[in-house]
Amino acid sequence: DDDCGWIMDDCTSDSDCCPNWVCSKTGFVKNICKYEM
């Protein structure tokens, strides 16, 4: 499914992002997808 959020995509929750990616809740990158190491 290519319709998921990659880095710097807006999100409101982790479900808006790709698998293994999370929606940042804090800081400069608040509410964007980031890779969860």
From Swiss-Prot:
Cell division is among the record's keywords: no
GO function term, MF aspect, one: calcium channel regulator activity
Keyword Ligase: no
A cellular-component GO term for this protein: extracellular region
Cystine connections: 4-18, 11-23, 17-33
Subcellular location(s) of the protein: Secreted
Superkingdom: Eukaryota
InterPro entries, per the entry: Huwentoxin-1 (IPR011696)
Expression across tissues: Expressed by the venom gland.
Primary location class: secreted
Coiled coil: none
Keyword entries, A-Z: Calcium channel impairing toxin, Disulfide bond, Ion channel impairing toxin, Knottin, Neurotoxin, Secreted, Toxin, Voltage-gated calcium channel impairing toxin
Domain notes from UniProt: The presence of a 'disulfide through disulfide knot' structurally defines this protein as a knottin.
Family: Belongs to the neurotoxin 10 (Hwtx-1) family. 01 (AU5A) subfamily.
Annotated function: Blocks calcium channels (Cav).
Protein name: Omega-sparatoxin-Hv1a
